[in-house]
């Protein structure tokens, strides 16, 4: 049984990536590992703990949404909240778990108008040693 790592942030493109990752995993009999990567706060004041707590709370909500999507597909997932920028988090988890592939949406939140790809998929395509599937949002 292989593993597929999916980057998920709760955005429309994240939903599309999760759906694709779940479908591929179901077809291949693989396990899905959903990753929410977030940059840890810098050293700029006393609000660091509150900031980190809020981001982790958001990550837990995003993972609950991912588990709900997975249940609809009949696929069990594992989830990881990783305090690193998204691309770095995905590469680290994929390497640690010897993943078959990484699946991400073409944009996260917020989308910059006119960009061909968001920064996370762009970095993954250049830095990942594993195959990367970039999925556009369904409503694009």
Functional labels for PLM-detected ranges:
Residues 132-140:
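Short, flexible loop segments at boundaries between secondary-structure elements
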Residues 30-31, 75, 99, 130:
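Short glycine/serine/threonine/alanine-rich loop segments
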Residues 101-126:
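Glycine-rich, Arg-bearing micro-motifs that act as flexible, cationic patches
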Residues 50-61:
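A short acidic, glycine-rich active-site loop
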Residues 2-47, 53, 78:
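Small/aliphatic-rich secondary-structure junction motif
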Residues 23-26, 92-95, 126:
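Solvent-exposed polar/charged
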Residues 68-102, 139-140:
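Structural beta-alpha unit
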Residues 36-38, 105-107, 136-137:
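Short secondary-structure boundary segments
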